[in-house]
A protein has these predicted regions:
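Carboxylate/His-rich catalytic cores and anion/metal-binding grooves
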Residues: 189-217
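Beta-sheet repeat architectures centered on beta-propellers
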Residues: 1-153, 277-293, 299-468
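Conserved hydrophobic/aromatic positions in well-ordered beta-strands
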Residues: 119-122, 162-163, 202, 250, ...
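Asp-box/WD-like beta-propeller blade repeats and closely related beta-sheet repeat scaffolds
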Residues: 166-196
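Beta-strand initiation motifs
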Residues: 126-131, 168-172, 219-225, 265-272, ...
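Surface-exposed loop/turn positions within WD40 beta-propeller blades
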Residues: 115-117, 157-159, 198, 206-208, ...
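Surface-exposed extracellular loop regions of Gram-negative outer-membrane beta-barrel proteins
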Residues: 119-123, 249-276
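Intrinsically disordered, low-complexity linker/loop segments enriched in Gly/Pro
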Residues: 216-236, 258
Length: 468
């Protein structure tokens, strides 16, 4: 007699409920949940995408060598730390910074800080160096440094003459003035912004003057072809310029956008073309080149421009994307634009970082992080401003060798230098005496509004701890 009920067989196994959540992530989208596509999270704080999985970011790391120098006031050899009062008085306050790549045989890369009366150089494996200014020269406000061949040029802004260092450790920093002026040339004027381009130094002076120096000589320019007036008489002010393609510069003014183009080495065919775009741009150091585009941050948010077409007589038309930051619009609305002049940007092989001030911050202590590999916003990063209150991004020093890899360093106005996305589990940005200044990293992830049938957004806070 057959049993009335057969045992449960493999074909009779009930189906398990299907998961409705995201199996992997591709970035951050802060719009309303119904607008967020699958694979995106509503918010990510201090997080990184690793093969579709969000993990806590690594921290700031200040190497011990970042506060070494070969001399302090009054120039005696020493091993310098934060507790050296003479060093702090003379060289802690920093007005600008960047990188000096020695073009000589050694090819060393140094982090450079601009202080009141000297340039301070630091790098791995060596005691740093201090290059003093010539007597009577000082820096007392925000400045920009650029390198053209072996020269470092310090742009002081306003009506102040720019400075330069010739690249030899025995030299001092001097004013950027010609020893003699060739016929048909003029001395370069004071500038608010500069860059090296096609063996020339390009300076933005006053409201309208785009000045291109002579080749190999940053002190003077051709008075006929080396200066062009950009949107003259319209009331807006020159802010920044970034190389675009092989023969053009994207010139950003406070309220207008232009393309300067010159194919001829002598600049005899130069032209300037105004682009049809509205903008309010007050953050010159956010203008950078990456992925064959120019990126910048203005009141509309992060925007990009690339060459759309080149017409007759080398007229350049741009393709402008003003929607880049639409997915992080809530963060853009929180930016403290009062401090826009302090904002900056940096590029690595994997990411683009925009340093800004949010909400009540008065210094750039927030990073908006764009992931170049997935072409999406990855996170916004902040650090503990209670424990690390004085650490903020004044300037970036990209591709600085440390522990056999190029690292992105940030330079703070208090003289601290730290590599980003390196130290595990905490931020370390310097020392008080011999005690490290540390702060834990808190990461928060908010989903796009539904997971496994739930209509509620979920927040997760976690700490990733690695024990060796």
């Amino acid at each position: 007699m057959l049993p009335r009920h057969q045992p449960l067989g493999p074909r009779d196994t009930p189906d398990l409920p299907a998961a409705t959540g995201d199996l992997a992530f591709a970035g951050m989208d802060m719009r309303a949940p119904p607008l967020v596509p699958p694979g995106f999270v509503s918010s990510a704080l201090n997080l990184r995408l690793v093969e579709g999985v969000y993990e806590s970011r690594r921290g700031w790391a200040a190497p011990a060598w970042s506060r070494h120098a070969s001399a302090d006031f009054p120039y005696r050899a020493s091993y310098l730390r934060d507790d050296d009062a003479a060093y702090i008085a003379a060289y802690a306050t920093t007005y600008g910074g960047g990188v000096f790549a020695d073009p000589g045989d050694e090819g060393d890369t140094w982090i450079v800080r601009v202080c009141a009366t000297a340039l301070v150089f630091t790098r791995e494996t060596e005691i740093g160096r201090i290059v003093p200014f010539a007597p009577g020269i000082t820096v007392s406000g925000a400045c920009q440094i650029i390198q053209n061949f072996n020269q470092l040029i310090i742009i002081r802004g306003g009506e102040l003459t720019s400075l330069y260092w010739a690249g030899a450790w025995s030299d001092v920093v001097k004013e950027l003035v010609p020893s003699s002026i060739a016929s048909g040339y003029a001395a370069v004027p004071p500038a608010s912004y500069g860059l090296a381009w096609r063996e020339r130094t390009v300076l933005l002076s006053g409201r309208d003057e785009l000045v291109l120096s002579a080749i190999f000589d940053s002190t003077q320019y051709d008075a006929t072809y080396g200066i062009i007036y950009v949107n003259r008489g319209r009331g807006d002010t020159l802010r920044a310029a970034v190389p675009l393609g092989s023969s053009s510069l994207l010139v950003l003014k406070s309220q207008s956008l232009h393309v300067y183009t010159s194919v001829a080495a002598a600049l005899t065919d130069a032209r300037i073309d105004t682009q049809p775009v509205e903008m309010q741009f007050d953050s010159p150091l956010t203008a950078i080149a990456a992925d064959n585009k120019v990126w910048w941050l203005d009141r509309r948010g992060v925007r990009t421009a690339e060459i759309g077409s080149i017409e007759v007589d080398n007229k350049v038309l741009l393709r402008i994307d003003s929607t880049v930051s639409d997915r992080i619009a809530p963060l853009i609305r929180r930016i403290a634009w009062k401090y826009a002049a302090l904002f900056s940007a940096a590029v690595t092989t994997e990411r683009i970082y925009f340093s800004v001030a949010l909400d009540q911050q008065t210094l750039p202590q927030t990073l908006l992080v764009w992931n170049r590999q997935v072409s999406a916003w990855e996170s916004y990063d902040q650090w503990n401003t209670t424990d690390l209150v004085n650490f903020a991004v004044l300037a970036w020093a990209p591709a600085v060798p440390w522990l056999n890899e190029p690292r992105l360093f940030a330079i703070s106005a208090n003289g601290r230098q730290a590599a980003y996305d390196y130290h595990l589990g905490e931020d370390l940005v310097g020392y008080i005496g011999t005690t490290p200044r540390r702060a834990a990293i808190t990461s928060t992830l908010t989903t796009r509004g539904y997971t496994a049938g739930s209509a509620e957004a979920k927040k997760f806070t976690r700490a990733q701890v690695q024990l060796d």
